[in-house]
Amino acid sequence: MKVLALRHSVAQVYADTQTYLHDDSKDEYENAFLISNLTTHNILYLNYSLKTLKILNKSGIAAVEVQSPDELFALIRCNFTYDYENNIIYLHDYSYYTNNEIRTDQHWITKTDIIDYLLPGWKLTYVGYNGKNTRGHYNFSFSCQNAATDDDIIIEYIYSNELDFQNFLLRKIKERMTTSLPIARLSNRVFRDKLFPSIVNIYKKVINVGPRNESMFTFLNFPTIKQFSNGAYIVKHTIKLKQEKWLGKRVSQFDIGQYKNMLNVVTTIYYYYNLYHSKPIIYMLGSAPSYWIHDIKQYSDFTFETWDPLDTPYSTIHHKELFFDKDVNKLKDNSVLYIDIRTDRKNMDWKEWRKVVEQQTVNNLNIAYKYLSTGKAKVCCVKLTAMDLELPITAKLLHHPTTEVRSEFYAILDAWDIITIKRFIPKGVFYAFINNITTENVFIQPPFKLKASPTDYIVALYALSNDFNSRQDVINLINKQKQSLITVRMNNTFKDEPKVNFKNIYDWTFLPTDFELKDSIITSYDGCLGMFGLSISLSSKPTGNNHLFIINGTDKYYKLDQYANHMGISRRSHQIRFSESATSYSGYIFRDLSNNNFNLIGTNVENSVSGHVYNALIYYRYNYAFDLKRWIYLHSIGKVTVEGGRYYEHAPIELIYACRSAKEFAILQDDLTVLRYANEIEGYINKVYSITYADDPNYFIGIKFNSIPYEYDVKVPHLTLGVLFISDNMIHDVVTVLKKMKTELFKTEISTSYTYMLSDNIYVANASGVLSTYFKLYNMFYRNHITFGQSRMFIPHITLSFSNKQTVRIESTRLKINSIYLRKIKGETVFDMSE
């Protein structure tokens, strides 16, 4: 949902939009809670409070002040990510398609012939990093840029087996127009750009697990972050390949040689980072034109020193000349060298050309070896061709996508490679490598071992759920790692499936109850965003590839109502109850009936079950931003601090009742996942609370009334306000609690309206208005370690007779309390108090 704050109402009516007028009788937190549970996507918030907007944003719900009709129109028609700390909005708005336009934030693409393969009459526009060049389009009170681009389509095409780009583009645009927006993927770059600077500023040692190409620019500014990926393809791995011949396959209709060179250099930079943890100088031989340097400099400041007879417009220092073996001593330490020298073929015969290429390969290798043999902190990426060749067995082989699969590939070498064993590799094996293997990631660091690292902060986004990891090892890592942000695939199946298919692999699934954590928050993507200064206008869908975000060692753990809080906890319930259910009271009715409480009079105001816990369980797929386990735990240890809102402290038994209702709901819905989740949450409640039951009671608390509007034949009709199991020396403690509660007890508005047979030969009258007081009394006794209440549901009633009687109904009648007393069962009254 998105909340657009206005000072004045608007005349125009928008679809899926609701107006909320700030309620001055309630505080900012209560207003935020009410807004968060509205069911439309767009909320126009009138007479708004800035504090309420802040509360919503910290909860991950985008809430923005809107000052003009243009701002309102821009925000209501699309989704966006909001940097609420810096007041920047990143639109995810593809309406530019109506300009016959596709967009890119990679400059090199604009220098290709891609324009020849677009849809007829369409153009390509460069919009800069995260669309920052579009800021001039929006003259708004907040900074605004459109981060939507078609780079995802272009990159997917490059790695696909399809050649016809126009058909591919058309199909993908049609898919985009007919499917829901993948908001998490679109906002992820904004999130990473907020996340990693904040972590690096706090923690000296940061580990990042499983980065992919979409993060290749993000980490250029963080050479000290230790990356873990799937490892490199090295020369000794070629032993498994059978020899093949030249293939000559076209990969892309437009020229992607620039992309290949950029990937080679970025791969080399990250390889260098992992060895030396600092930024290198970047030397490039055969560099022209290297338009992609502009892309890298948009993200991070590097020194590029280049050699080529042709211009390299974006390099820092360019030598418009050839580079020779004798020039190697010009290259400094703390650097990487990219050798991409290749003479143009022109009209040369292919056999003669082949000799030239092979000689250049030897020359390139000689330059690489000479560069690495002296000095320190050096890495080289060198262009090679398929030929009979000796290479170090530890050399890293690269084959990033290029326009045509021909004979070229690349190798990354370091100082250790040149002194290790070399192996002779025949030309046919290199062709097998080129023909069959595409390097899909610029991160070629070794795989991460699933072990906790006490001094490091571990980030693992979408990286550990794959079933080639041990599920238990993943759980152990999360349980033991003190400081981390780790995601795992959420189990949102209905059959409680332990693993689910994702693309061509399987992922393990997890529920919050799989982990045993303290000082940790388990939330959704939106809930996590709120903790890092961002909010989002579109929540994750309840089904599909969703993840739990687990933040260990956060200073926000005790800020229960600020982060990963209960905002939106009833939203799905409202959507169902006020649309397709039998009555808007359906949730209340079901919760009471499923706990054998058949008195439904006033069920919507006097319910016997925690609605928070019930909704958090049965609709967890919709509201898992709320960290239920944390909420339960902080209540159990009495460490709940709230800034505002209507706060009601649940008795632990209310939480148990909620789990029982949720389990019955799950059985009726055939939802095995909710069934297990509710069972495990009930087990967790019993673990963190020390709940004892007076199932064999010896005392009870009774309420005597001035008069009863029914006929009765018992000596003194009374309401049993609860039973206890105590020793005689605890009577004083019980009396102390009753005295503390005296005012509230006598203010309880108890009423009755019918009689019924509680069981055979037990004729009773109902008593409404009791439960709230009962649960408060329960909490008082619980905190004083006094066993109060039974394991079965407390059903307030007044016993009238121990024989079968005809039931009657009357107008609801208020009962005046005469006295409240503590009495031993089958014994004497030990305490009595009147108002």
From Swiss-Prot:
Stored Pfam families = Rotavirus_VP3
Give positions of region: 2'-5'-phosphodiesterase activity.
693-835
User: Which GO terms label this protein's molecular function in UniProt?
Assistant: GTP binding; mRNA 5'-cap (guanine-N7-)-methyltransferase activity; mRNA guanylyltransferase activity; oligoribonucleotidase activity; RNA binding
Q: Which PROSITE patterns match?
A: SAM_MT56_VP3
Coiled-coil ranges per UniProt: none
Tell me which domain of life the UniProt entry assigns to the organism this sequence originates from: Viruses
Residues of the region (2'-O-methyltransferase activity) are 246-428
Q: Where is the active site?
A: H718, T720, H797, T799
Residue ranges for the region (GTase/RTPase activity) are 556-692
Catalytic activity as recorded in UniProt: a 5'-end diphospho-ribonucleoside in mRNA + GTP + H(+) = a 5'-end (5'-triphosphoguanosine)-ribonucleoside in mRNA + diphosphate; a 5'-end (5'-triphosphoguanosine)-ribonucleoside in mRNA + S-adenosyl-L-methionine = a 5'-end (N(7)-methyl 5'-triphosphoguanosine)-ribonucleoside in mRNA + S-adenosyl-L-homocysteine; 5'-triphosphoadenylyl-(2'->5')-adenylyl-(2'->5')-adenosine + 2 H2O = 2 AMP + ATP + 2 H(+)
Q: Which InterPro entries match?
A: VP3_Rotav
* Keywords, alphabetical: GTP-binding, Host-virus interaction, Hydrolase, Inhibition of host innate immune response by virus, Methyltransferase, mRNA capping, mRNA processing, Multifunctional enzyme, Nucleotide-binding, Nucleotidyltransferase, RNA-binding, S-adenosyl-L-methionine, Transferase, Viral immunoevasion, Virion
List localization entries: Virion
Single Gene Ontology BP term? symbiont-mediated suppression of host innate immune response
**Region described as N7-methyltransferase activity: spans on this chain:** 171-245, 429-555
GO cellular component terms, A-Z:
viral nucleocapsid
| E.C. numbers | 3.1.4.-, 2.7.7.50, 2.1.1.56
Family per similarity comment: Belongs to the rotavirus VP3 family.
Quaternary structure and interacting proteins, as annotated:
Interacts with VP1. Interacts with VP2.
Quote the entry's note on domains.
Contains a bipartite N7-methyltransferase domain, a 2'-O-methyltransferase domain and a GTase/RTPase domain. The C-terminus contains a phosphodiesterase domain that degrades the 5'-triphosphorylated, 2'-5' linked adenylate oligomers produced by the host cell in response to IFN stimulation.
Q: What does this protein do?
A: Multifunctional enzyme involved in mRNA capping. Catalyzes the formation of the 5' cap structure on the viral plus-strand transcripts. Specifically binds to GTP and displays guanylyltransferase and methyltransferase activities. Has affinity for ssRNA but not for dsRNA. Capping activity is non-specific and caps RNAs that initiate with either a G or an A residue. Together with VP1 polymerase, forms a VP1-VP3 complex positioned near the channels situated at each of the five-fold vertices of the core.
Q: What is this protein called?
A: Protein VP3
